[in-house]
C-alpha cells in the first residue's frame, strides 16, 4: 500500500543513520541523552556529570550504537553478544537459570537494551 504516510516514513528513514560508538564525544553524548531521558521520566536522580553510565556499558561483549536523524543523536541501542566465554548481560543476570545452561550447551545470544 503506497500511502502518503508510507512515503513520508521512507523519506524520513533516508536521513536515519546508525553508528557504532567506541568512545570519545559520541559516547559522552549517549550518556547525556540517557541521563536526560531518565531524569525526565524519574528513573534516576541528579548526577553532577549530567551523564548516566551503567556497569553494562563497557563490558568486552557490549556494542553501543547511536541513532542519528539529520545528524542529531535521537536514540541509542546497546547489544551484548552473549557466549559461554562472555556471559555478561542484563538478561543473564535476570534469568541465569534459563540462560546459563543454554550457554553451556554452546548457544549464543544477542541481548538488546535501550
Predicted regions and their residues:
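Short amphipathic alpha-helix that is part of the acyltransferase structural core
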Residues: 4-57, 62-69, 73
Amino acid at each position: 500500500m503506497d500511502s502518503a504516510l508510507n512515503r513520508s516514513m521512507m523519506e524520513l528513514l533516508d536521513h536515519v543513520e546508525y553508528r557504532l560508538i567506541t568512545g570519545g564525544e559520541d559516547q559522552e553524548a549517549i550518556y547525556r541523552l540517557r541521563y536526560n531521558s531518565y531524569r525526565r521520566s524519574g528513573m534516576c536522580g541528579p548526577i553532577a556529570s549530567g551523564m548516566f553510565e551503567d556497569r553494562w556499558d563497557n563490558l568486552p561483549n557490549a556494542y553501543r550504537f547511536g541513532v542519528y536523524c539529520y545528524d542529531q543523536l535521537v536514540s541509542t541501542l546497546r547489544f551484548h553478544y552473549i557466549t559461554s566465554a562472555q556471559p555478561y548481560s542484563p538478561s543473564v543476570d535476570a534469568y541465569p537459570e534459563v540462560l546459563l545452561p543454554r550457554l553451556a550447551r554452546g548457544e549464543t545470544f544477542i541481548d538488546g537494551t535501550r
